[in-house]
């Protein structure tokens, strides 16, 4: 699948997911290449159809994009609930376990998600896998002592790599932390790994989102299809 085909599937999933946002709602808006298409469609509906809703974003990038369309964006602490959060995912399996954080927004994404009545992910078909872990697992760590955390990860066989930008500088999250990517290839026991990571001093959050999502809208060549989590 080339990039143009992949983008077409992402766009189709984003447009389908935008239908979930209705007048008067408080909607969580995620981060990433697929969410960009979602926000474009919500912006179009706001400007052309008069859709009025309030957004809570998981990154400053998404906030800037939404506000460029005139969409009202507020801080998460200024709302008492979020009706639905729509976000992307880097991988998702049949048990609705996912990896997120390829865009370095995993902490804000998880905070918004855990305060939402409904969580929806939008992905293209390449993101649906049998076993998660092929995509490097992002872990957000504070800069102080980050090298020590990386050594611990190396000792556990997690194959950590500090994420750098195109200039060779450390990638910084919106909270000014570092991102360490774990090249695990496959994750057979995600719950155990999640507990190990979050109990490591210096780790702020990890990109494992386990059985959190309610629906996954998959961009498919035959049209968007919906995976529904029966355990939620």
UniProtKB/Swiss-Prot annotation:
Oligomeric form and interacting partners: Homodimer.
Gene giving rise to this polypeptide: rpiA
Matches recorded under Pfam families: Rib_5-P_isom_A (PF06026)
One cellular component term from this protein's GO annotations in UniProt: cytosol
Active site: 109 (proton acceptor)
Entry EC no(s): 5.3.1.6
A GO molecular function held by the record: ribose-5-phosphate isomerase activity
UniProt KW keywords: Isomerase
PANTHER family, alphabetized: RIBOSE-5-PHOSPHATE ISOMERASE
Name listed for the protein in its UniProt record: Ribose-5-phosphate isomerase A
């Amino acid at each position: 699948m080339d990039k143009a085909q992949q983008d077409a599937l992402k766009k189709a999933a984003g447009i389908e997911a935008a239908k979930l946002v209705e007048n008067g709602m408080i909607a969580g808006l995620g981060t990433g290449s697929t969410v960009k298409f979602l926000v474009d469609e919500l912006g179009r509906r706001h400007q052309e159809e008069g859709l009025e809703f309030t957004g809570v974003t998981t990154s400053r990038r998404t906030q800037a994009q939404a506000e460029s369309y005139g969409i009202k964006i507020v801080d998460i602490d200024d709302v008492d609930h979020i009706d639905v959060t729509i976000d992307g995912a880097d991988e998702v399996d049949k048990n609705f376990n996912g990896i997120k954080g390829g865009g370095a927004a995993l902490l804000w994404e998880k905070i918004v998600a855990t305060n939402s009545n409904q969580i929806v992910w939008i992905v293209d078909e390449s993101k649906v896998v049998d076993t998660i872990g092929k995509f490097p697992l992002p872990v957000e760590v504070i800069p102080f002592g980050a090298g020590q955390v990386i050594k611990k990860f190396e000792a556990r066989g997690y194959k950590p790599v500090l994420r750098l930008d195109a200039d060779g500088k450390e990638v910084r999250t919106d909270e000014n932390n570092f991102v360490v990517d774990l090249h695990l290839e496959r994750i057979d026991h995600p719950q155990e790994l999640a507990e190990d990571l979050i109990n490591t001093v210096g780790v702020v959050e990890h990109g494992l989102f386990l059985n959190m999502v309610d629906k996954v809208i998959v961009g498919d060549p035959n049209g968007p299809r919906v995976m529904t989590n029966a355990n939620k």
